C-alpha cells in the first residue's frame, strides 16, 4: 500500500444492509464505540421497507446513507467503494459487530507498521444462540 502520510490515516467502514432493523443497532454501536477517531462510516441500503433507515439516522457518526434499490450485496459494496474517501476500506455487515472498541485502531496500526501490507483480516467468531465458534 502506498500511503504518503501514515500518521493521518482515515478508514472507511462500509455497511451494506437491507431490512436489518433487528441487527443494525448493534453494528452501528460497535463502530460508534471505536477508539480510533478518523472513521468514515457509510451505510449502503438496498431500499429497506422496515425501520432500518430510521435507526441508522439515530447515529451521528454515520457520514453518508444511500438508500436505493441495488443488484445485491456486491453491487452495494461497490457503491460504497466508489464514494469511500478513506486510506483503508473495510466492510462490516449489518448483522456483524466488532468484538471490542480497539479493533479499528489495531487494523490501522498494522497498516502503519508494514508499508507492503495491502489487506488484512481477522479471526471470526460465529455466534448462534447456544455456542460460539472461532475460525
Task: Identify the residue ranges that each predicted region occupies.
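Conserved donor NDP-sugar-binding/catalytic core segment of glycosyltransferases
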Residues: 101-134
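Short aromatic/hydrophobic "clamp" motif used to bind/position activated sugar donors
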Residues: 89
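Short beta-strand/loop segment that forms part of the nucleotide-sugar
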Residues: 38-47, 66-67
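N-proximal low-complexity "stem/linker" segments adjacent to membrane-targeting elements
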Residues: 1-32
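A conserved acidic beta->alpha catalytic loop
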Residues: 45-54, 93
